[in-house]
Amino acid sequence: MNRERLIPLLNEIAQLLQSNGHPGQAEYISALATVAEWDVTAVEPGLVSGAIWGGSGSVWDVAQFNSREERRRFMHALLRLVDEMRQAGIKAPGAESSAAIMTSWLTSGII
């Protein structure tokens, strides 16, 4: 993975989560950014985890945001994360299905 793109992206996602009242999810993403600073190859298990791409309570599943604009920024950041994972050859079915759903929502204007 490209450390120069991944760490700022993870920090952006964590900041959006924190500023919108999701401290637990923000802490998880911040921890991944810290791991990536030390060893970008060690972050893969965390990136494919259900903590990000799983069901209720996962990072991608948070729904409450201060504005529609912030929620859209959050989803676009997650889509960039999926792109980074693809470029690195990381296979994550949960990420792929979540990306398809978010893309559909963003394209249709639901979000």
What are these regions (language model features)?
Residues 19, 48, 52-55, 87, ...:
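Intrinsically disordered, low-complexity segments enriched in small/polar residues
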Residues 1-33, 97-110:
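Short terminal alpha-helical segments
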Residues 60-111:
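Amphipathic alpha-helical binding modules
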Residues 3-6, 43, 81-82, 88:
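Solvent-exposed, well-ordered amphipathic alpha-helical segments
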Residues 39-75:
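Short, charged early-sequence alpha-helical segments and their helix-coil boundaries
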